[in-house]
Amino acid sequence: MLRQIIGQAKKHPSLIPLFVFIGTGATGATLYLLRLALFNPDVCWDKSKPEPWNKLGPNDQYKFYSVNVDYSKLKKERPDF
């Protein structure tokens, strides 16, 4: 398959940006899914620990992007179970 892509790129150089953008998008999507699977507290791979989200403290950042929140200054607002 890679040989076909390289062959098409040699025959039609105008397709090179298309291949670059598709490859970049596929790589970014794969890395984002890997990040969600490994670092998201809602995903539980180990069945012996059924609720991993209860171990997160109020200072843990688990969002991908937060605009104006400084997690180091947050107070604990939830009860202990």
Swiss-Prot record:
- Protein name per its UniProtKB record: Cytochrome c oxidase subunit NDUFA4
Q: Which family does it belong to?
A: Belongs to the complex IV NDUFA4 subunit family.
One GO CC annotation, please? mitochondrial inner membrane
Q: Which residues carry this modification: Phosphoserine?
A: 66
Q: Which residues cross the membrane?
A: 15-37
Organism listed in the record: Gorilla gorilla gorilla (Western lowland gorilla)
| Coarse class of the protein's main subcellular location | mitochondrion
- Chain ranges on the Mitochondrial matrix side, renumbered to this chain: 1-14
In UniProt terms, what function does this protein have?
Component of the cytochrome c oxidase, the last enzyme in the mitochondrial electron transport chain which drives oxidative phosphorylation. The respiratory chain contains 3 multisubunit complexes succinate dehydrogenase (complex II, CII), ubiquinol-cytochrome c oxidoreductase (cytochrome b-c1 complex, complex III, CIII) and cytochrome c oxidase (complex IV, CIV), that cooperate to transfer electrons derived from NADH and succinate to molecular oxygen, creating an electrochemical gradient over the inner membrane that drives transmembrane transport and the ATP synthase.
Q: Which gene encodes it?
A: NDUFA4
What keywords does the record list, in alphabetical order? Acetylation, Electron transport, Membrane, Mitochondrion, Mitochondrion inner membrane, Phosphoprotein, Respiratory chain, Transmembrane, Transmembrane helix, Transport
Q: Which residues carry this modification: N6-acetyllysine?
A: 10
> Could you list which ranges are Mitochondrial intermembrane topological domains?
38-81
Compartment(s): Mitochondrion inner membrane
Tagged with keyword Electron transport: yes
